[in-house]
Curated annotation (Swiss-Prot):
This is Oxysterol-binding protein-related protein 1D. May be involved in the transport of sterols. Residues 290-321, 735-764 form a coiled coil. Residues 92-229 form the PH domain. Residues 344-362 have a biased composition (Acidic residues). Belongs to the OSBP family. It comes from Arabidopsis thaliana (Mouse-ear cress). Expressed in roots, leaves, stems and flowers. Residues 340-362 are annotated as: Disordered. One of its GO terms (molecular function) is lipid binding. InterPro entries: OSBP_sf, Oxysterol-bd, PH-like_dom_sf, PH_domain. It holds the Pfam family PH_11. The lineage of its organism: Eukaryota, Viridiplantae, Streptophyta, Embryophyta, Tracheophyta.
């Protein structure tokens, strides 16, 4: 398609210039109205006016200043309408003109020449006034929007009249558009807060445009709509196969009878053919219905992405530094009111964090990063208060000034050097599109969806449960605080532990293996002072139960994760209660928050945790944590804030602030009761900080997670045949043997289908049982059976005992 720029200039000769009217009493293009072929199409806006020869002469005689290409003074330009060149009437006519396109924060808004023809919007860079010249072969059908665009054309015509030879050569060399947008598959949105702006979304990119005046924008929007009307949307009923479709077999019958085939055989052939056609028709209906659903989903995604990306453009890149200090204080105080605004259970429901009007001003929100980056929090004195209380701001309990004394453990076990990376893959991983697999499971429970091994990480859900205990030292610290009589510091450390379990999910884009019914996992970490055991206790619903024994405490729980796919995201809702019991009798309980995985179809895949977590237990204090849902415009996502409340008085005695993938801090007291100007962050104390991996690893596993599937020397002979470390497909995936892993996964899925029949026949888990409240509790006896290697009553659920020998010989860890 020939552009309207980089073409030979328009001649000002009356005989060759199509801009010149044929008579003094006729406006341009007026004579073409009676023979318009597009009279049935919607007409253009009445803002478009016809330009006469006198008007053009006045325009060409004006002293026109150079147009500001940076768009700084574009709003001051005058535009009174749209102008037609040649015989231009109806919806089929081309449209052209100047609009300002958003480039980036460095360049801002830049002028571009736009041309709309046959439903395709093309745009070109403007390198000077001589470049905006229309092709004489096409200018008769061009409708130019805006006087600024006309000035450019007239200026180019006057300035280039003495270079007609060179222009003729240029006319034969069409300029390639800098970009093209097909309006048939695009959505147009006009800004509500700025009457000169609009956005065009194609599904893969968004053009943010600004016109010189609101009249120009109205003309462009109407032109876009007219162009879209040339390609009407097909109704869903128009593409569905007809219910009354009749298949005639008369010709087949005549042909068979002519060949001497008997009547009985002919009827059988007819019946077979009609049956096959009926099956094909039914399949076509199903495919057509899915096609309609997917189209509607994509259109909805288009609209949502337009709003979100327009919001990003509206966001100011830099903030005035003089307002930073005041905002930091006000944002901090807003934490208390924001967290305590609602105590209802409705907080656990999904919040539409992305539901933002794209063109409205940004609403101020709490910014954890402004606080975490404060200079006071980076000082050495702040770090030294990590394990201390602060009596200066909470002097009701004098023991806050004492340091926590944790008795040192004397190792009475051989130290095990654990691996710090996974084996190098033996095969090259094949790229597989996730959308192509899960598109047929929209709205379904994903626990029953079978995915290729390429979407898994070499860990099972049983091992993921133990990964939540990576920072178990926080429980040990809570135990010691309780021994010193400080229940407040105990619940603060428990809150930090509850948040720390989410740290390892950052950057993890693969799902763990779904355990087989009866599959188990053990973890004996004497260096941490704990041992852990978990078992899959139910197949439908899929429930995993776990139990952990520490020094002075026990931790247990069961988890039933309900997952659903909603087109653009996967939502995981955990069902179950986690319980922590200390030897002194105090019990604390909480439940996990909702997890969602976004951008399944388009964009960068990421996960987010959101909702409200309530930690109940103890006699004096309770805690409430709010995981803020991430939105597209969040500069600092993954925020967590909350407070500890004194159950006796109802007062807030401490607040917690941080991010679930970085660190958690606390401040004693209620900062909202302090005088104006008080900076609570000078008293902030670090509770927990994530151990960052020094190098990037496969599957983004942390060093702790890498050790979970390792078989250390001497372990293979003690493991039961149900342990996750012996699962063959998971082991093949860890070694990078993808073909073998896929084959084993299919084989085990066949075995897993028998699990439901076993459960229906009254199958019961070996190491857990339900209590009166319906929760699974550990029966005991596993570690005793492990010492005796008493696995006679344990079934080899993987049906591959020969694997144990190969694993025993390949173990690479050593005792020191």
């Amino acid at each position: 398609m020939n552009p309207l720029c980089c073409i030979a200039p328009v001649s000002i000769d009356d005989r060759t210039n199509p801009v010149v009217a044929k008579s003094s009493n006729h406006h341009l293009g007026l004579e073409a109205i009676p023979v318009s072929k597009h009279a049935s199409k919607p007409s253009f806006s009445t803002q478009a006016s016809w330009i006469s020869q006198d008007q053009l002469e006045r325009l060409s005689s004006e002293v026109v200043d150079d147009v500001n290409l940076d768009g700084k003074d574009a709003s001051s330009s005058s535009n009174k309408g749209c102008f037609f060149f040649g015989n231009c009437v109806g919806a089929g006519a081309g449209v052209a003109g100047i609009m300002y396109k958003w480039v980036n924060y460095g360049k801002g808004w830049r002028a571009r020449w736009f041309e709309l023809e046959d439903g395709v919007l093309s745009y070109y860079k403007i390198h000077g006034p001589d470049k905006i010249v229309m092709n004489p072969s096409r200018e008769k059908g061009v409708r130019v929007i805006g006087e600024e665009s006309v000035r450019y054309i007239r200026k180019a015509s006057c300035g280039s009249s003495n270079r007609l030879g060179a222009s003729a050569v240029a006319a034969s060399r069409p300029c390639k558009p800098f970009g093209e947008i097909h309006l048939k598959v695009s959505s147009i949105r006009a800004s509500k807060s700025d009457d000169k702006r609009l956005a065009i979304f194609t599904g893969t990119k968004t053009l943010h445009l600004r016109c010189v005046s609101k009249e120009n924008r109205a003309a462009w929007v109407e032109a876009f709509q007219v162009a879209k009307d040339l390609f009407p949307r097909v109704a869903s009923g128009d593409i569905l196969p007809s219910e009354d479709a009749v298949v005639s077999t008369e010709k087949l019958r005549e042909k068979l009878l002519q060949e001497g085939v008997g009547e009985t055989v002919v009827k059988d052939c007819e019946a077979i053919m009609l049956s096959e056609v009926s099956v094909l028709q039914n399949r076509l209906k199903v495919l057509t219905h899915k096609h309609i659903i997917l189209l509607d989903t994509l259109r909805q995604l288009e609209t949502e992405k337009i709003e979100l990306e327009a919001t990003v453009v509206d966001e100011t890149k830099e903030h005035d530094s003089c307002c930073g200090q005041g905002r930091r204080f006000s944002d901090f105080y807003s934490v208390m009111s924001e967290v305590s605004a609602s105590d209802s259970e409705a907080d656990n429901e999904s919040q539409d964090g992305a539901d933002v009007e794209s063109d409205e001003d940004d609403v101020p929100y709490f910014d954890t990063n402004d606080i975490l980056s404060a200079e006071a929090m980076r000082s050495a004195s702040y770090r030294s208060r990590e394990a201390e209380g602060n009596g200066s701001i909470y002097d009701k309990d004098p023991f806050f000034s004492d340091r926590l004394q944790i008795p040192a453990r004397i190792p009475q076990y051989p130290y095990v050097r654990r691996r710090d990376n996974l084996p190098e893959p033996k095969e090259k991983e094949k790229p597989v599109g996730l959308w192509s697999i899960i598109k047929e499971n929209i709205g379904k429970d994903l626990s029953g969806v079978c995915l290729p091994v390429y979407f898994n990480e070499p860990l099972s859900s049983l091992q993921k449960c133990f990964e939540d205990l990576e920072y178990s030292y926080l429980i040990d610290r809570a135990l010691e605080w309780g021994k010193q009589g400080n229940e407040l510091m105990r619940i603060l450390n428990i809150a930090a532990f509850a948040v720390s379990g989410y740290a390892s999910t950052e950057g993890r884009q693969c799902k763990p293996f779904n355990p087989l019914l009866g599959e188990t996992y053990e973890a004996d970490y004497p260096d941490k002072g704990l041992r852990f055991f978990s078992e899959k206790v139910s197949h439908h619903p899929m429930i995993v139960a776990c139990h952990c024994e520490g020094q002075g405490w026990n931790f247990w729980g069961d988890s039933n994760i309900k997952g659903k796919f909603w087109g653009r995201s996967i939502q995981l809702d955990p069902v179950g209660v986690l319980t922590l019991k200390f030897d002194d009798g105090e019990i604390y309980q909480w439940s996990k928050v909702t997890t969602s995985i976004y951008n399944i179809i388009l964009g960068k895949l990421y996960c987010d945790h959101y909702g409200t977590m309530r930690i109940k237990g103890g006699s004096n204090y309770s805690c409430r944590l709010k995981f803020k849902e991430q939105s597209v415009i969040d500069r600092n996502p993954r925020q967590v804030h909350g407070f500890v409340q004194d159950n006796r008085t109802g007062e807030k005695v401490a607040i917690l602030i941080g991010k679930w993938d970085e660190a958690m801090y606390y401040v004693l007291g209620d900062p909202t009761t302090k005088p104006k100007g008080y900076d609570p962050m000078t008293e902030a104390v670090l509770l927990w900080e994530r151990d960052k991996s020094p190098t990037k690893t496969r599957y983004n596993l942390s060093p702790f997670a890498i050790s979970l599937n390792e078989i250390t020397p001497g372990m293979i002979d003690k493991l039961p045949p149900t342990d996750s470390r012996l699962r063959p497909d998971q082991r093949h995936l860890e070694n990078g043997e993808y073909e073998s892993a896929n084959a084993e996964k299919l084989r085990l899925e066949q075995l897993q289908r028998q699990a439901r029949r076993l459960q229906e026949k009254g199958w019961k888990p070996r190491w857990f049982e339900k209590d009166e409240e319906g929760n699974y509790r550990y029966l005991g006896g596993y570690w005793e059976a492990r010492e005796k290697k008493d696995w006679d009553r344990i079934t080899d659920i993987f049906k591959k005992q020969q694997q144990r020998n190969s694993l025993s010989s390949s173990s690479s860890s050593t005792f020191l």
